[in-house]
Amino acid sequence: MSLYIGLMSGTSMDGIDAALLELPSNQLIHGITKQYSDDVRRNLDDLIIGNHLTLASICQLNTLIGREFAEAVRQLLIEIKVHPKEIQAIGSHGQTVCHDTSGNIPYTLQLGCGHTISSLTGITVVADFRTRDLVNGGQGAPFAPLYHQQIFSKVNESVAVVNIGGIANVTFIAKNQMTRGWDIGPGNCLMDAWIYKNKGALFDKNGVWASQGEVIHPLLEYLLQDPFFHLDSPKSIGKEYFSLSWLQKHLKPDYTPADIQATLLALTAHTIAETILNESGEIKQLYLCGGGAHNTHLKESLARLLPGITVKSIAELGISPDYLEAMMFAWLAAQTINQIPVNLASITGAKGIAILGAVYPIIKSY
């Protein structure tokens, strides 16, 4: 038995998920979510939403986020009463602040200094997972399909898994076939940004506000024309693309805020449903994970758009929808520490197999 910790803060920026994973069983021992401090959250909003990309702010945030990730580890270990020396390594995704693979020089940046996390926790850290994939010709994301493949390794039917974080991504798994996956488009990011702007809430719990509005169909059709939705897979996208500024270019003064929220939920539902339906009717089971798995109105919308397909939370399999991505980075850290390469060719388009991440080691004294 080996213990690894995974750390994840997604494009929703709603906090740091920390998961203690037992391998090789892939059993979640314990998980916590630590909210960002007000200062860090405000600085992230300024950086990503306001595009205040100063060199000083990036460097400072890199250290500050590293400290907060380390604090999440400390809280996790205190709650579960495990000593840092019992942990083989931490896998840290970091906080994505920019990601764009559309140009001649693709780039990605995740903040959360690996040296800081390692020094403050006394545990070896693996971080910066996306860069190697970009260098190898991949999209740098999503990685979730790799771990979904582990969970459904004994699948006897074709299934789809959709992770609805800030950005939604899909995994298609079928017996005796290569696992495939890519980013679909906005998951929660636009809905979260719109309700925060209008009501000061971090998210629309259960989609209640969206359910009170009416879908603006001309707006929905216009949003669906965005070029990203028509790109071939593999593809990836960042929250900075599907931002409030992207949305506001398409709004008219007579649109009500609740109707816009309803339309944004419909955008997420339609893009997910279209992705699933394009699989030629092979998919009969759709599992949801991420924060969007708790949005009952979104789940109901997907069920209406996908007749004949069972839509359920991955929680029904006994797997936490909230900590699945953190678990994945614990698993990825184990692959890196043990020099086990992964194959992302059918997911990100990367050429060949690779060992992902950079290692920030700690010398353990026993």
Swiss-Prot record:
Pathway: Amino-sugar metabolism; 1,6-anhydro-N-acetylmuramate degradation; Cell wall biogenesis; peptidoglycan recycling
GO biological process, one term: amino sugar metabolic process
Catalytic activity: 1,6-anhydro-N-acetyl-beta-muramate + ATP + H2O = N-acetyl-D-muramate 6-phosphate + ADP + H(+)
Keyword ATP-binding among UniProt keywords: yes
GO molecular-function terms, A-Z: ATP binding; kinase activity; phosphotransferase activity, alcohol group as acceptor
Keyword terms of this UniProt record: ATP-binding, Carbohydrate metabolism, Kinase, Nucleotide-binding, Transferase
Ranges that cross the membrane: none
This enzyme's EC code(s): 2.7.1.170
Residues involved in ATP binding: G10, T11, S12, M13, D14, G15, I16, D17
Physiological role: Catalyzes the specific phosphorylation of 1,6-anhydro-N-acetylmuramic acid (anhMurNAc) with the simultaneous cleavage of the 1,6-anhydro ring, generating MurNAc-6-P. Is required for the utilization of anhMurNAc either imported from the medium or derived from its own cell wall murein, and thus plays a role in cell wall recycling.
Family: Belongs to the anhydro-N-acetylmuramic acid kinase family.
Listed name of the protein: Anhydro-N-acetylmuramic acid kinase
Gene field: anmK
